């Protein structure tokens, strides 16, 4: 793992030492067209907007000769469960990889999803990413991909049609979830977890298939959940996060000038993501309040009980593999636990 990380750094230093690409010189370079798949279904979602800015930046840095099309989930005829296969086959050259659904291929990424292990702040999430980065780089290489950016989304909250008097006893309430560990926690809270893709949550909530939805606040407003939900609970679940990865063969085939453009824009995306997440959360909450949604906090005594309910799930998860155990130990050390 250390050799992989060192090799990546050496390659990056070589690429970054190149002089900036001039548009005139770029006329002799090949035209390259890539496709990037997003995990979102709406073009206005902040991660789609931010990745589109990366694509624009790459095009500008290469005189328009390296273009990246950002496709929404489902736009190409397949959804996120096929993203790994699509990028491995070079059907797409770039993809958002979310640890929330990538645990089937890289189980140790589940450390990002351990509810209440961290407090939901970006600083703590970054500590977990840094502590497990060598493990992740090695795992990505086995999938034939390489990350050029990493960024967080907002914390995972709950929007409900009905008030929730006691979070330690949901009394059979059906809650939409999308991560396995969240499902286990909802069960411990005496609720019923229901797996649903984001594109189906509005109609499911409208028809009563679920009474509450677990997701980030921007996703709530992107899917108009303020029309069917009336109570926003600051659950503070682990934020989703994205690695933006590229196909290794497609990347290696690029001229060094294009690689440099990707790295520079990848760094910009990582920095931009930090600023975006706070802004979009505030905007989404304001929009929901205008629609009559009440923003509520979970009482401190209930939250303390929820942490006790969640903690055994961390150890249960860690026992599944040596990699999981290593990731949890690294995360705890980084967080001072």
Placement of each model-derived feature along the sequence:
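Short, low-complexity disordered leader/linker segments with a strong preference
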Residues: 1-33
């Amino acid at each position: 793992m250390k050799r992989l990380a060192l090799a990546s750094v050496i390659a990056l230093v070589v690429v970054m030492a190149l002089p900036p690409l001039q548009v005139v010189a770029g006329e002799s370079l090949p035209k390259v067209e890539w496709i990037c798949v997003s995990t979102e279904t709406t073009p206005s979602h902040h991660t789609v907007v931010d990745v589109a800015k990366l694509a624009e930046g790459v095009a500008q840095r290469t005189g328009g000769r390296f273009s990246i099309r950002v496709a929404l989930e489902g736009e190409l005829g397949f959804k996120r469960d096929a993203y790994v296969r699509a990028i491995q086959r070079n059907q797409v050259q770039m993809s958002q990889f979310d640890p929330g659904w990538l645990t089937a291929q890289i189980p140790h990424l589940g450390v990002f999803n351990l509810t209440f292990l961290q407090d939901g702040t970006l600083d703590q999430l970054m500590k977990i990413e840094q502590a497990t980065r060598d493990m992740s780089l090695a795992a990505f290489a086995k999938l034939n991909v390489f990350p050029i950016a990493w960024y967080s989304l907002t914390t995972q909250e709950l929007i409900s049609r009905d008030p929730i008097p006691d979070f330690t006893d949901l009394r059979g309430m059906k809650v939409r979830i999308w991560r396995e560990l969240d499902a286990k926690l909802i069960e411990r809270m005496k609720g019923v977890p229901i797996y649903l893709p984001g594109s189906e949550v509005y109609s499911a909530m409208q028809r009563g298939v679920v009474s509450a939805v677990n997701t980030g606040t921007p996703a709530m407003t992107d899917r108009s959940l303020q029309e069917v939900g009336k109570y926003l609970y600051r659950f503070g679940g682990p934020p989703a996060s994205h690695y933006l990865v590229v196909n290794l063969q497609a990347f290696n085939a690029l001229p060094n000038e294009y690689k440099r453009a990707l790295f520079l824009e990848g760094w910009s995306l990582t920095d931009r993501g930090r600023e975006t997440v706070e802004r979009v959360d505030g905007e989404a909450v304001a929009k929901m309040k205008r629609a009559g949604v009440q923003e509520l906090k979970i009482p401190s005594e209930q939250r303390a009980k929820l942490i006790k309910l969640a903690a055994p799930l961390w150890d249960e998860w860690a026992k599944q593999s040596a990699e999981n155990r290593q990731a949890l130990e690294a995360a705890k050390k980084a967080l001072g636990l």
